[in-house]
Curated annotation (Swiss-Prot):
Matches recorded under CDD domains: Ribosomal_L22
GO cellular component terms given for this protein: cytosolic large ribosomal subunit
Source species of the chain: Leptothrix cholodnii (strain ATCC 51168 / LMG 8142 / SP-6)
Originating gene: rplV
Signal peptide: none
Membership in a protein family: Belongs to the universal ribosomal protein uL22 family.
Protein name, UniProt field: Large ribosomal subunit protein uL22
Listed Gene3D superfamilies: Ribosomal protein L22/L17
Domain of life where this protein originates: Bacteria
């Protein structure tokens, strides 16, 4: 039995999110939460909230035992890019791109 949590449109580069997601893929949820708690990256806090949501979904909707849950799959996909403008000298301008990401976390036995 698998349960999923999805976080969309997070202001995070998908490459930076994938670095953290690779740390917890396949681990038990208790160990994964500990890893995320002590990982000093912005993505760790965001992925931790998504994992906690998936755990709560599994417990509430399926009546799953938290001690037996594992992170069966986690992946971070690229979302829409916010394009911004930065004024430069002599009437020019540069484009600033602010990437977003979608995070998918699945927990199961």
């Amino acid at each position: 039995m698998e349960t999923q949590a999805i976080v969309r449109g997070v202001r995070l580069s998908c490459d930076k999110g994938r670095l953290v997601a690779d740390l917890i893929r396949g681990k038990k949820v208790g160990l994964a939460l500990d890893i995320l708690t002590f990982t000093q990256k912005k993505a760790a806090g965001i992925i931790k909230k998504a994992l906690e949501s998936a755990i709560a979904n599994a417990e509430h909707n399926d009546g799953a035992d938290i001690d037996e849950l594992r992170v069966t799959s986690i992946y971070v996909e690229q979302g829409a890019t916010l394009k911004r403008f930065s004024a430069r000298a002599k009437g020019r301008g540069n484009r600033i791109s602010k990437p977003t990401a979608h995070i998918y976390v699945t927990v199961g036995n």
